[in-house]
Amino acid sequence: MHRVFISYHHRLDQGYKDALCRWNEQHHIFIDESVYDGDIDDTNMTDDDIRKAIRDNNLRKSTVTLLLVGQQTQYRKHVDWELYSSMYDAPINHRSGIVVIMLPTTGCKCTFAGHDGEIYSVFRGTDWQTNNLLATNSDYQNHFPYLPNRIIVNLMQGAKISIINWDDLTPSRLTTLIDNAYNDKDNTTYIFPKMRRYNYNPQ
């Protein structure tokens, strides 16, 4: 089993995170490393200071990040920091693989096969997409509503990130997605748009 960090909107999507952890306890899919020690006070911190704090503390033991995407996940600065830090390949704490889980609140119906063979091993029978089928930022937004821009711009550059819907999860599918993310994490090149420094609350 791989060590996994779960990134999500704590106020709105805690119930899904708790449900995923209970499900994992039943099926023994991953080792949960998502310890939450409270928000980081980023006053007077540079982007690199934040990245080091997240990577060296919150993500230190994990090798794969599971991102739970709800309607407001993309607006949370701490989620953006966790994604940035997961993608960053530091000398001591190396980059992580990433798997995206679209929550029912997004209304998403599509999946994304980010790794070789997943169309058949994971996404057979679903409305799957690949980089060959999506060309623009708008294409990704239309197929995957509420997906954070940091994920979109990296998918557009060919990053090996898979996307599955909450309702399509099975133990075998999630195990395969985590394994693939781990196995390809050192073969993925990420790009790093500027980190979000403020939360935005549309509602």
Q: What do the predicted segments below correspond to?
A:
Residues 22-24, 82-86, 117:
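Glycine-rich, phosphate-binding/catalytic loops in enzymes
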Residues 1-64, 92-94, 173-203:
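Conserved N-terminal substructure of TIR/SEFIR domains
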Residues 95-102:
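Conserved beta-strand/loop subsegment of P-loop NTPase cores
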Residues 3, 16, 108-203:
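C-terminal interaction surface of TIR/SEFIR-family domains
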Residues 72-89:
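Conserved TIR/SEFIR loop-to-helix hotspot centered on a Trp-containing motif
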Residues 11-15, 72-75, 106-108:
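Short acidic, S/G/P-rich loop/turn micro-motifs used as interaction or catalytic elements
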